[in-house]
Amino acid sequence: MDKLILGRYIPGNSIIHRLDPRSKLLAMIIYIIIIFWANNVVTNLLLLAFTLLLIFLSQIKWSFFFNGVKPMIGIILFTTLFQVFFTQGGSVLFQLGIIKITSLGLSQAILIFMRFVLIIFFSTLLTLTTTPLSLSDAVEALLKPLVRFKVPAHEIGLMLSLSLRFVPTLMDDTTRIMNAQKARGVDFGEGNLIQKVKSIIPILIPLFASSFKRADALAIAMEARGYQGGDSRTKYRLLSWQLKDTLAIILVVILGIFLFCLKSPSRLT
C-alpha cells in the first residue's frame, strides 16, 4: 500500500501544488501532445529535463515517481523489445540467424521507452499534487461547455473521483485476500504460467464480490442523503484561475513550439 501511487495525494505547498487543477490538467494534455511530437534525442532530453525540473519544484521525493514506473515495467519492456526486434529499417547493427536489430528499430525503441517514462512521470506528478476531488472538479469544469451537447460533465467528474478513491481500497482488499489465501496454503509464485493464472482466480472472485458490495453500499448511502447530480449542486471549494495558471499554460505552449521547431521530420537523430 505504501508503494501505491495512483489515486494518492501528497500534501504540500509547492508552486505545483498551488496551481489550479484545471491548468495542470490542460498542461498535461498539451504535454502529452508534445511528447508525441518529439521524435529525436534532443527534444526528448529537453522534455526529460523539463519534467525533472517540475518534479524538483513539487518538493516530492523522487522515490514516488520511480514507484509510479514500477507497475508499468513489464509493458514498457515488452513494447520496447518488440520495437527492437520487429521494426526493420536503416543499417543492421546485429544479426543472429533470423534475429536482426536495425538502427531504426533501436531508435524507435528508445523513443517508445522515453515516451512511456515521460508520460508516467508527468501523470504521477499531476495525481501527487492534486487531490482526487480537485481533479474531478477540473474535469467537470473543462467539460462544462459540452453540457449543451448532452455530455454529462458532472457525472463524468463524479465517476473519476470515485474511481481514484476506490483504487487504494481495492488494493487493500487485494492484499487482505492474498494474505488470507496464503494462510490457507496457496502459493502464488510456484508452478508454470497456467498454474499461476489459476492461482489468481481465488483472488478475483472475492475481490469482485467485495467491489460490488462496496458500490452497492455507496449507491444506497448517496440516495439516503438525497444526492442529485447536475447544475443544482454547489461546490464547497470554488476553483480560482489566477495569473500563475495562465503563465504555466503559456510556458508549456512555448516549450511545445520550441521543441516542434527542433524535431526531426521523420526519424531519431
Swiss-Prot record:
It is found in: Cell membrane. Keywords: Cell membrane, Membrane, Transmembrane, Transmembrane helix, Transport. It is a multi-pass membrane protein. The chain crosses the membrane at residues 28-48, 49-69, 73-93, 109-129, 246-266. Forms a stable energy-coupling factor (ECF) transporter complex composed of 2 membrane-embedded substrate-binding proteins (S component), 2 ATP-binding proteins (A component) and 2 transmembrane proteins (T component). May be able to interact with more than 1 S component at a time. HAMAP family: EcfT (MF_01461). Transmembrane (T) component of an energy-coupling factor (ECF) ABC-transporter complex. Unlike classic ABC transporters this ECF transporter provides the energy necessary to transport a number of different substrates. This is Energy-coupling factor transporter transmembrane protein EcfT. The gene is ecfT.
